[in-house]
């Protein structure tokens, strides 16, 4: 307000109400069953083979579908694509973590992000995603996605969540033992496929298994707030496009209460970011600059 920004939150104020849903996995309910082309089944072992990402919309998640392998799950327009030779509509996509070689560091980070992998799979029509670390052995080596936080839109749809997007039915974290298991009878050599991917050669194909998954999630909703200030754009058309500068207050969320404060406040992450954000806004206003796009 003192800097002179236009309030852009709820009710013409600076604050915007944000509902965040904490989703907690009931790990005793997690079931995943592989089925081969002959109808033979194999029950996977929770934490050794897989751990579900808690579903932010459904307390009882159920999914089944044909497994397809799509490498890193990357699709770059006019460039590298793990999806160009495979149809994943209605299927469960198996991906490995990481990104193809030869990208600049920011793109490597972008395409390695699990949320971006699941978003791409969803846009291609997949019903579910399994992301596997080929080096993980299961158990303590598998990152346990037992709890996740998701920002919800007013209609209780997903605004942002690390893992789920749209109406994906399931997202699982998997292990190297699971990867070896689903490569059996595929006609593909797992080590060779992984080596090809590491060298930038995409490799995508249908696997000889389907999977059925079910698990339970408990939801707890709580309210947080964004602080929104606007500098309107000067161009009558381009003002409808927005440049966003953002920062966050907490460091690693919340934890044990110390002197009445449970927030993990951080100096560099991210008090310096908030200070920088305020300084950017001050410079915009004090310089007399009139950006064409809204900021």
Identify the meaning behind each predicted range.
Residues 15, 80, 115-118, 171, ...:
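Extracytoplasmic/secreted envelope proteins and their assembly/folding machinery
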Residues 1-93, 97-100, 219, 223-226:
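Noncatalytic luminal/extracellular "stalk/propeptide" segments of secretory-pathway proteins
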Residues 60, 82, 88, 94-162:
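Flexible, low-hydrophobicity surface segments
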Residues 1-48, 131-149, 155, 169-170, ...:
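Protein/peptide-recognition domains central to ubiquitin and immune signaling
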Residues 19-20, 29-31, 53-58, 69, ...:
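Second-shell loop/turn segments in exported
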Residues 12-17, 206-215:
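Short Pro/Gly-enriched beta-strand edge/turn motifs at strand-loop
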Residues 1-7, 24-26, 35-38, 85-87, ...:
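Catalytic-core environment of secreted peptidases
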């Amino acid at each position: 307000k003192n800097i002179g920004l236009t309030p852009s939150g709820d009710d013409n104020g600076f604050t915007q109400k944000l509902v965040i849903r904490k989703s907690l996995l009931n790990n005793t309910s997690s079931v995943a069953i592989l089925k081969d082309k002959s109808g033979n089944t194999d029950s996977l072992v929770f934490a050794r083979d897989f751990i579900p990402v808690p579903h932010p919309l459904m307390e009882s998640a159920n999914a089944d579908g044909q497994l397809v392998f799509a490498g890193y799950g990357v699709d770059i327009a006019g460039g590298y694509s793990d999806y160009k030779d495979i149809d994943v509509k209605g299927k469960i996509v198996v991906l490995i973590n990481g990104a193809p070689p030869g990208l600049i560091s920011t793109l490597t980070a972008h395409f390695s992000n699990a949320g971006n992998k699941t978003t791409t799979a969803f846009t291609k029509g997949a019903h579910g995603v399994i992301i596997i670390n080929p080096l993980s052995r299961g158990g303590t080596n598998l990152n346990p996605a037992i709890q996740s936080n998701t920002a919800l839109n007013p209609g209780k749809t997903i605004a942002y969540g690390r893992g789920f997007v749209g109406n994906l039915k399931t997202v699982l974290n998997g292990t190297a033992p699971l990867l070896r298991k689903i490569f059996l009878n595929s006609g593909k050599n797992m080590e060779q496929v992984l080596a090809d991917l590491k060298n930038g050669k995409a490799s995508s194909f249908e696997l000889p298994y389907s999977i059925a998954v079910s698990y339970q999630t408990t939801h707890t909703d709580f309210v947080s707030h964004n602080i929104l200030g606007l500098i309107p754009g000067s161009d009558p058309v381009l003002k409808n496009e927005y440049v966003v500068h953002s920062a966050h207050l907490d460091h690693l969320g919340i934890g044990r209460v110390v002197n009445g404060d449970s927030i993990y406040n951080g100096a560099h992450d991210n008090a310096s970011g908030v200070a920088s954000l305020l300084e950017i806004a001050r410079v915009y206003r004090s310089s007399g600059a009139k950006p064409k796009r809204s900021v």
